[in-house]
């Protein structure tokens, strides 16, 4: 059968079949072959879509993995202008955690990764662009916790008030607070930045999130930069090393 042909071709066992044949699992070599096969199938599907799009008069599909809550600003600040210049390009955007982002890129499901934390297996990726985003505090204009009476705030100002963190920046924030012997009162840790901001909009806490200087927030919120040079995340745009990009991704 095909399994025996493959095992003979690669000179190794690909499956472990437990006694009785009721349980089968991949060997390490089998896992490697499985992942490579998935990538090959992904490339074939991608090529088919590009050919179909080309025949239909389109330029192709741009597939991007993004960290949670990043797509809105990415669309507003970059993709909208890109679309006006290349109106026949289609888009597939996936907002997923870093682990899944890494998997999507390596499997060829997406070609470009935009992340707010280091990708897993970082040696397999090439970073084309990076920038720093500082952590900011967002609070309601009528907040009982902070006042809009100075241009910035200090880390000390955040002690003993309910904080709402986005998960992407929580580890960094806790680390800096620990080093500074500050013990924050964290009310919630949220998967997305938008969820953290929602608490601040309802005036139930102060949101701590990463934000570029150009990002706009609801009119009822006050934005203050936290004056601490340790409180920033590095945003990166990465591709898989040594893998040729599709024509639309190269554009």
PLM-predicted stretches and their roles:
Residues 59-121, 190:
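Central regulatory/effector-binding core of bacterial HTH transcription factors
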Residues 97-110, 116, 168-224:
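Hydrophobic hinge/microswitch elements
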Residues 29, 33-36, 74, 78, ...:
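Short amphipathic alpha-helical coupling segments at ligand-binding clamshell hinges
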Residues 145-146, 152-153, 159-181, 245-250:
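Secondary-structure junction motif
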Residues 9-12, 33-55:
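Alpha-helical linker/hinge and terminal dimerization helices associated
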Residues 74, 222-251:
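A late-sequence structural motif
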Residues 56, 124-163:
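Flexible hinge/capping segments at coil-to-helix
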Residues 7-28:
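A short LG(V/I)-centered, amphipathic sequence patch enriched
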């Amino acid at each position: 059968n095909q399994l025996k042909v493959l095992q003979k071709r690669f000179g190794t066992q690909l499956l472990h079949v437990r006694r009785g044949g009721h349980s089968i699992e991949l060997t390490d070599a089998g896992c490697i072959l499985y992942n490579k096969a998935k990538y090959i199938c992904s490339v074939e599907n991608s090529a088919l879509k590009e050919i179909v799009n080309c025949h239909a008069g389109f330029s192709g599909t741009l597939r991007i993995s993004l960290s949670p809550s990043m797509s809105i600003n990415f669309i507003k600040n970059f993709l909208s202008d890109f679309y006006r210049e290349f109106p026949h390009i289609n888009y597939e955007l996936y907002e997923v955690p870093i682990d899944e982002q890494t998997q999507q890129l390596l499997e060829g499901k997406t070609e470009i990764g935009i992340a707010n934390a280091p990708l897993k297996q970082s040696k397999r990726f090439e970073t084309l662009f990076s920038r720093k985003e500082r952590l900011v505090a967002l609070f309601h204009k009528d907040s009982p916790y902070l006042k809009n009476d100075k241009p910035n705030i200090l880390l000390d100002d955040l002690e003993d008030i309910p904080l709402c963190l986005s998960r992407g920046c929580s580890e960094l924030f806790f680390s800096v607070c620990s080093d500074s012997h500050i013990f924050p009162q964290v009310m919630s840790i949220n998967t997305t930045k938008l969820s953290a901001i929602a608490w601040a909009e309802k005036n139930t806490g102060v949101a701590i999130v990463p934000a570029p200087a150009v990002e706009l927030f609801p009119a009822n919120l006050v934005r203050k930069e936290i004056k601490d040079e340790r409180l920033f995340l590095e945003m990166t745009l990465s591709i898989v090393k040594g893998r040729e990009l599709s024509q639309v991704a190269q554009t």
